[in-house]
Regions:
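Conserved catalytic motifs of ABC-family nucleotide-binding domains
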Residues: 155
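Conserved ABC ATPase signature
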Residues: 93, 134-138
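Walker A (P-loop) phosphate-binding loop of ABC-type ATPase nucleotide-binding domains
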Residues: 40-44
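Hydrophobic anchor residue at the start of the ABC signature
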Residues: 148
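Catalytic Walker B motif of ABC-type/P-loop ATPase nucleotide-binding domains
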Residues: 159-162
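Conserved ABC ATPase "signature" region
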Residues: 101, 105, 110-130
Length: 174
């Protein structure tokens, strides 16, 4: 297995108005590993994730993604990962395909690259036959699958998922 450090969190702290949401957290994730950050509500999981995806700056400590500092090199770090938020990030009036096409344009994919990638992802998440229906007709699990396809669209080196199995049936969780 590749021993390249993909994520390196070192003594990370994040405080809000004197409350420590994350307190002296350290861990490493190696390339190719699947890593789950587990803990009770309010333990700082989402705060840690938001730090890794450059939405928050730590109060102290450091976090790097593929060797790049999440504070000093935030723009570069953002090109390295895909993100699937806990909250739905889809427009109910767009079709599944339209969501992916819109994101493809935002990622500056050519129409050909986008069409190829979208076809692959719709097959992967088993939404091919539903791709041209408005998202408002999708079940909760189908919407979650579309969120995952959106996170995978830029072919990221790292995929961050916040509550990845939320709304998925048991078979889809595997």
């Amino acid at each position: 297995m590749d021993r390249t450090i993909a994520i390196d969190v070192n003594r990370l702290c994040k405080s809000y108005d004197g409350h420590k949401a994350v307190d002296d957290l350290s861990f490493q994730v190696y390339a190719g590993e699947i890593f789950g950050l587990l803990g009770p509500n309010g333990a700082g999981k989402s705060t840690t994730l938001r730090t890794l995806i450059t939405l928050l700056h730590p109060t102290s400590g450091t976090a790097t993604v593929l060797g790049h500092d999440t504070v000093r090199e935030a723009d570069l770090v953002r090109t390295l990962f895909g993100y699937v938020p806990q909250e739905r990030a889809i427009d109910r009036f767009l079709t599944g395909r339209e969501h992916l096409e819109l994101l493809g344009a935002l990622y500056h994919l050519t129409k050909e690259e986008a069409a190829k990638r979208i076809a692959e992802l719709l097959k992967l998440v088993e939404l091919e036959e539903h791709a041209d229906r408005p998202a408002k007709t999708y079940s909760g699990g189908m919407k979650r699958k579309l969120d995952i396809a959106c996170g995978l669209l830029p072919n990221p080196k790292i995929l961050f998922l916040d509550e990845p199995t939320l709304g998925l049936d048991v078979q889809s969780r595997l």
